[in-house]
Amino acid sequence: TYDSMIKTLEKSVDQGFDFVMLHNLFLMEGVELNRDEFRNKYRMKTMYRLLGSNYTKIDGEFIAEYEEVLVENKFFDFNDYLSIRALNLLFFSVFQGDLYKFFFRFLKDIGMPLVSFFESFMSPNPEHEWPEGYLRFVKDFKEAARNELYSSLDEMYSDAKEIYERNNDVGEPVRLNLYYYSRLMYSEKDWLNQVLRQHLIMENDKIDKNALRIADNILDICENLIIDLRQPCNNRILETEFDFEGWKQSKYREPLHNFRDGKRAINFSMRDSQMEKIRSFCEQNSNLNDRDFGFVAVETILPRSDLFYEIVYE
């Protein structure tokens, strides 16, 4: 069920795993669950989606790769599927993409359930006034999560073929995790800190002023850790009382307050190899608009740790 899955995810986070990933079940030819016996037993309903942008013409014949995705069964409905899909995005962004990693580790450190926070982030309370850009981001993702699904293979192939022939190329990215992760990294920075802070307060209305002050410091650092790929030099100097690199090296197994070592200035640097990788990427992709530029960056600059500065303590 959806609730049992949430409990398993929370338990995995609490156990301190370095990576926690969430994937929707898809069925393949030959697997046991794809037999009629099990489809009927569990009342499975499936739909189809393109596998990335893997469609093209070869010798005049249009071909496309796809997944057959489970969207309903006797234990959960389509709305549960969409909620899982939204959680999938945030688990990918944080655990594989290192998005605001210190902030989300801090939430765990102060006892806030991470999965509940993710659920709230992707389902903003309509009674609260939120930034327009944030609401648009959530709306865009949920619409894209619906629109990536097709009732039949014929419908999927027809749509992909029409897009390919119209553009003489693939269309908008259908790898939703990467695309919306790239938006959080580069296109949505004007509201991200404000929204994360507000959700922190709403999820824990008894949070004390000191914890909120630390959260503000961490949010500021996390925002500045993301390299502006078009202008990669960050000359900002911030202050903090914590050794975040030491906390990271401990794999976050100790509480953050164990790494309090007095107020110090920090700046942000890149390794030579990292600078060269980014320079080369920019030369090859300078013609792209900002959103495509960000998407291609998170898709091709690997490891993704190279998308972030390193903290240097003065």
Name the predicted role of every residue range:
Residues 1-121, 226, 232, 237-247, ...:
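A structural motif corresponding to the C-terminal lobe/cap of the Radical SAM core domain
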Residues 79-190:
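C-terminal non-catalytic alpha-helical accessory regions
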Residues 157-314:
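Charge-dense, extended regions
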Residues 2, 74-81, 131, 182, ...:
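Generic detection of long, well-ordered alpha-helical segments
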